[in-house]
Amino acid sequence: MGLVKGNCGCYWGIKGHWSRNCSPVCEIANKNYYSRRGIAPRRTFWSVSNKSLVHLDANSLMIDYENVFYYTTDITSNKAIIESSERIRQDHGNPSVLINNAGVANGKTILEESEDERRRVFNVDILAHFSLVREFLPDMIKHNHGHIVTVASTASFLARPQLVSYSCCKTALIAFHEGLSQELRMRHNARKVRTT
């Protein structure tokens, strides 16, 4: 979270979004991690206000920590995202910070990669971001408070062999971020919902 806090101030200044009443400290944040095998993306919500940490992961995790909660969720499924989002809102409230950092890659050439493998990359690396934003952005707009962080990759600018589908998704994330930023400002008049 320290990296996010450091980058937020820099970005807000560049975009002219300085605000004294909005701290970049995350009240409830969504982050993404990977399982040990690197194939199961995990989403994590962190709450400063009630000190809860909520993980969404395709695998069932059984690590017992105080104030840490796990939700088994297949983020390639929009239905599963909606169901988990509803449970999170019931149990922890709406997140005010969403950090989209999910990413998987197959490491195969275009000809080697199966259609199912390619669709999985797109479902995790870009489409899950749309689904999560649709779930949590309305409350941020309503309160004109929140932050959505979209993490792309250098692969957005340099497509490498055996990472073409991954690079396509990461490039799409840049357009996603830029379009979302403009919609918040020009269509929703939610200038205090930040994007990084």
From Swiss-Prot:
Keywords: NADP, Oxidoreductase. The lineage of its organism: Eukaryota, Fungi, Dikarya, Ascomycota, Pezizomycotina. The active site is at Y166, K170. InterPro entries: NAD(P)-bd_dom_sf, Sc_DH/Rdtase_CS, SDR_fam. It comes from Cochliobolus heterostrophus (strain C4 / ATCC 48331 / race T). Coiled coil: none annotated. Belongs to the short-chain dehydrogenases/reductases (SDR) family. SUPFAM superfamilies: NAD(P)-binding Rossmann-fold domains. This is Dehydrogenase RED3. The keyword Oxidoreductase applies. The keyword Oxidoreductase applies. Disruption phenotype: Significantly reduces the production of T-toxin and decreases the virulence to maize. It catalyses: a primary alcohol + NAD(+) = an aldehyde + NADH + H(+); a secondary alcohol + NAD(+) = a ketone + NADH + H(+). Pfam families: adh_short. PROSITE patterns: ADH_SHORT (PS00061). It comes from the Eukaryota. NADP(+) binds at S47, D74, N101, R134, Y166, K170.
